């Protein structure tokens, strides 16, 4: 009789070896925020069949499956493994993208409902618009405190863990100034896990919104990525209509979607 077990683990080396294989199966890049924020903070489990490790999965505190992989010779078991996760009460839902069809479809098979969570975009390699004269400069350490204050006031993000300092040290954070006021910021984060990609993102001063600054900054970040031989990607949630419009105007297209899938 087939015996499948799920073993909690904090052994990142084993998980990373499996994850490298998972990444090779993706039909589009994974969003770095999803990987670095949500998946990274979830609980990893090794999947064992007859006492042999065949893959892993990641489950958050709410019982949502965020990532799962099984090796090639055991792919046929994916639907069974999802069923076992449900029956063992380890998961009640999944938040997965269509970039990995095997696990995504297995969860759809067991689903009772689903909702769209996040749109993930790739760049269409559009040329920089002639009218894009936004003056963008690299953020240097002396501006770090100003950026932190800007994020708190205009984004609602209180950086207490060195986020800004990390981006500045990696030369991945940019800003646009009007006189001495930060009117927009841009990030061009070179992925350490997906070496062909860079995640780009922007924010706009609350007093300077609806002027097209987000689109212009996104275009600038996209071209900074391309100059470093990286393909720009970005994402936004379903409820952020303004961001969706700015992203699409900048020349990005939605290549995959992260769905919340209810399993029970």
PLM-predicted stretches and their roles:
Residues 74-87, 204, 210-225, 244-249:
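Conserved acetyl-CoA-binding loop-helix of GNAT-fold acetyltransferases
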Residues 1-29, 125-158:
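Short amphipathic alpha-helix that is part of the acyltransferase structural core
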Residues 60-64, 70-134, 261-262:
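Acyl-donor-binding surface of acyltransferase catalytic domains
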Residues 26-36, 95-99, 157-167:
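A short, aromatic/hydrophobic, helix- or strand-capping loop or linear motif
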Residues 95-106, 234-245, 253, 262-264:
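Conserved beta-strand-loop-alpha-helix junction that forms the acyl-donor binding cleft
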Residues 29-86, 182-198, 203-206:
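Conserved donor-binding loop and adjoining core beta-sheet/short helix segment
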Residues 130-198:
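Flexible, substrate/cofactor-facing loop regions flanked by secondary structure
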């Amino acid at each position: 009789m087939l015996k499948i077990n799920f073993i909690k683990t904090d052994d990142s080396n084993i998980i990373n070896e499996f994850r490298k294989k998972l990444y090779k199966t993706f039909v589009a890049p994974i969003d770095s925020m999803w990987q670095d924020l949500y998946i990274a903070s979830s609980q990893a489990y090794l999947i064992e069949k007859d006492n042999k490790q065949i893959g892993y999965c990641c489950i958050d505190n709410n019982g949502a499956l965020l990532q799962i992989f099984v090796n090639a010779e055991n792919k046929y078991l994916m639907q069974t493994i999802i069923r076992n996760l449900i029956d063992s009460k380890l998961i009640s839902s999944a938040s997965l993208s269509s970039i990995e069809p095997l696990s995504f479809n297995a969860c759809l098979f067991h689903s009772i409902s689903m909702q769209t969570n996040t749109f993930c975009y790739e760049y269409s390699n559009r040329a920089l618009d002639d009218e894009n004269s936004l003056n963008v400069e690299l953020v240097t350490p002396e501006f770090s405190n100003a950026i932190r204050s800007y994020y708190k006031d205009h984004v609602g993000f209180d950086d207490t863990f060195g986020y800004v300092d990390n981006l500045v040290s990696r030369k991945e954070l940019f800003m646009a100034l009007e006189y001495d006021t930060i009117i927009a910021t841009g990030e061009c984060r070179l992925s350490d896990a997906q070496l062909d990609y860079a995640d780009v993102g922007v924010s706009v001063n609350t007093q300077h919104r609806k002027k097209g600054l987000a689109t212009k900054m996104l275009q600038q970040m996209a071209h900074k990525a391309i100059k470093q031989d990286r393909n720009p990607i970005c994402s936004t949630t379903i409820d952020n209509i303004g961001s969706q419009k700015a992203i699409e105007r900048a020349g990005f297209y939605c290549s995959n979607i992260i769905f919340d899938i209810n399993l029970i």
